[in-house]
Amino acid sequence: MTFLALDVGNTRLKWAQYEAPAVGARLLAHGAVFLENIDRLAEEEWSEMSPPTRILGCIVAGDAIKRRVTEQMELWDVVPRWVVSSPQEAGLTNGYEHPARLGADRWVAMIGARHRLLARGISKPCIVVMVGTAVTVEAIDASGKFLGGIILPGHGIMLRALESGTAGLHVPTGEVRDFPTNTSDALTSGGTFAIAGAVQRMVENITRHCGEPPECIMTGGAGWKMAPSMSVKYELVDSLIFDGLLEIASRRFAP
């Protein structure tokens, strides 16, 4: 019973095929394409893949992209299922005012992070950081309740906003410096420090609320860019959403 996990973000579609819809299942194949190229999946990357028995994905890219992805999966006789945030799943309690409005990628990443810690015998508060087109910073207490989270622009959105609203800021991407002395470095450093500062603030908030410092897990396509500038101890995990999808699938598709 092979299992296909899908993570459809704002920029790319990432996929991973596993031997089974179970935690710890062997990874058989994986890949990623930009959204403008998803219409080639059935003819290219997925054409030689063994047909999956189960498909589960999370998507934040909107209904038009979802339809295009679904069309590509018509080469298999399998109906994909999509994660919608719920009041509770896989041991995580959703503290959002309207649970279904929480982004599916945020929900799945938190489930992945929570179980990653539990598998190591760690039952502590946790901060989950996703660095992509947008940046999210989530807080989970030791009991597994999602307390709340923040959303801020990613590096690219910050720079484009400044370029469109300020004359003379169409400059090349710079480097992160403690004390930038040119506009390129000033812009890149400012965006990086804004994200790092948001994470630091959420760490302080949850430490005060829970009475102990949290674990911090970071993921996302641009997570590596943040790594050198983080002021808190963290773990960088590329596969966090796939980890969460496996946790959910192991329950939904249990024999």
Curated annotation (Swiss-Prot):
GO terms for biological process: coenzyme A biosynthetic process. It is found in: Cytoplasm. GO terms for molecular function: ATP binding; pantothenate kinase activity. The active site is at D105 (proton acceptor). It catalyses: (R)-pantothenate + ATP = (R)-4'-phosphopantothenate + ADP + H(+). It holds the Pfam family Pan_kinase. Its EC number is 2.7.1.33. Substrate binds at Y96, G103, A104, D105, R106, T183. A monovalent cation. Ammonium or potassium. It comes from the Bacteria. Its cofactor is NH4(+); K(+). Keywords: ATP-binding, Coenzyme A biosynthesis, Cytoplasm, Kinase, Nucleotide-binding, Potassium, Transferase. Belongs to the type III pantothenate kinase family. This is Type III pantothenate kinase. It comes from Polaromonas sp. (strain JS666 / ATCC BAA-500).
